[in-house]
Amino acid sequence: MQINHCIILCGGRGTRLREFNLTDQKCLIHINSVPFIEYLLKQFSQYKITLCTGHLGEQVEDYYRDNKNIILSRENKPLGTGGAIINALGKIKDDLIIISNGDSFCEFDLNHATKIFLEKDIDFLMITTDNFKDLGDYGMVEINEKSRIKSFNEKPSNAGLDNLMNCGVYIAKKRVFANYEVANISLENDIIPEILKNYKCYSHNVHSKVYDIGTPERIKIAENFFK
């Protein structure tokens, strides 16, 4: 089996960016004159791409409508990250997929991560990092000695010294989502805690920094990284 498809979540509202950006969909905010999502499309360029659109989705659709490598999956009502994925999976035949947030970027060896996923016959692989200074808006992951995920806590107020941070990139077997219907649910809060109980879910730690565009300050940091 091989991985051929990547889902990118592009429905974020960017509520903390309202003073900075009132008109553009969050993933289209320009970083050094380039829409942020272009960095993700380059990272996952070897795969067929599905963009999950929601808030201001028509902007993303207009931008990529003529791109033959991109499938557009629109949510007509708010679905959350989990619902957006389930909605997109209805149009995807592949059994293995990559999923990425559309407003954050983490540089890592993607081929190595997919090799581990396939060789170990993992059901759900979360890319994680120990390269972070504060919790910010990221989920914390606790693993055992074999890197199997023991617990996941989205946006905790504190974390243990040994916890890892979720990078917002996942490799998964489609079947882990089989019991979920299209609804307003969260991948991080609703789905991941449940699949940890029933599937082989592992962390792949990459030691890389995560760059996101959640605040004006983080946008400046991302601009310096992508120069």
Regions found by a protein language model. Give the residues of each.
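Conserved N-terminal catalytic core of the sugar/cofactor nucleotidyltransferase
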Residues: 1-8, 30, 34-101, 105, ...
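N-terminal nucleotide-binding beta1-loop-alpha1 segment
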Residues: 1-22, 200
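Histidine-centered beta-alpha loop that forms part of the nucleotide-sugar donor binding/catalytic region
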Residues: 11, 54, 129-130
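Hydrophobic packing residues within well-ordered alpha-helices of enzyme cores
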Residues: 17, 60-64, 222
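Conserved beta-strand segments of alpha/beta enzyme cores
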Residues: 27, 48, 69-71, 148, ...
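Catalytic-core segments of class I nucleotidyltransferases/pyrophosphorylases
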Residues: 98, 105, 111-118, 132-133, ...
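A short, conserved acidic/glycine-rich loop-to-beta-strand motif
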Residues: 120-130
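Short acidic-glycine loop/turn motifs at beta-strand connectors
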Residues: 142-148
